């Protein structure tokens, strides 16, 4: 019995140590480099109050019907009150969105990125997944992901997002290694 417990403990320690010392995800810059306008592009599909979007796979399945919406100013949409519209869409419930554009990094180095969402999200920057929540949650931090930015410039961004019922939020925190980790300003996003 002691051997089994020791083996299980060793496996847990190895998994935790591996995660703690994993290399940062290397981002790929946009090629060619764009000269974007401020904000992010977004396409929406609303399912009304009767047909509920329950998870990320269901949100993805309805996005083929999405229509362009008013561009987002960035990723600083704090938790709403119940019944308020989702992001720049007109509806408050059962909304799926595909968000595209670019994120600018002013210098190379190691950064931490963290998405916040209510409800689900699948977020990519520079071709690497930086956030994923497949189900329903309150306005909470998702994974904090360490990334390597090889050079200053613009990096492609793509987010699939959905909101079921209640309130909604979509935000991001970021920071360069050794510097302050804080809410990401809107001026680093372009479309």
Per-segment meaning from a language model:
Residues 22-112, 116-191:
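Extracellular/secretory pathway-exposed regions associated with glycan biology
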């Amino acid at each position: 019995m002691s051997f089994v417990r020791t083996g299980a403990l060793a496996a847990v320690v190895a998994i935790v140590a591996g995660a703690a010392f994993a290399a940062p995800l290397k981002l790929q810059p946009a090629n060619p480099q764009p000269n974007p306008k401020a904000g992010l592009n977004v396409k929406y599909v609303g399912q009304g109050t009767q047909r509920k979007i329950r998870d990320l796979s269901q949100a993805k399945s309805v996005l083929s019907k999405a229509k362009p919406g008013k561009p987002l100013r960035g990723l600083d949409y704090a938790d709403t009150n119940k019944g308020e519209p989702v992001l720049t869409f007109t509806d408050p419930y059962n909304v799926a969105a595909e968000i595209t554009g670019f994120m600018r990094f002013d210098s190379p180095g190691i950064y931490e990125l963290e998405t916040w969402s209510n409800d689900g999200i699948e977020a990519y920057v520079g071709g690497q997944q930086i956030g994923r929540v497949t189900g329903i949650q309150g306005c909470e931090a998702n994974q904090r992901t360490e990334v390597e930015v090889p050079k200053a410039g613009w990096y492609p961004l793509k987010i699939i997002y959905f909101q079921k019922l209640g309130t909604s939020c979509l935000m991001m925190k970021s920071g360069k290694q050794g510097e302050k980790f804080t809410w990401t300003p809107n001026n680093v996003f372009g479309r």
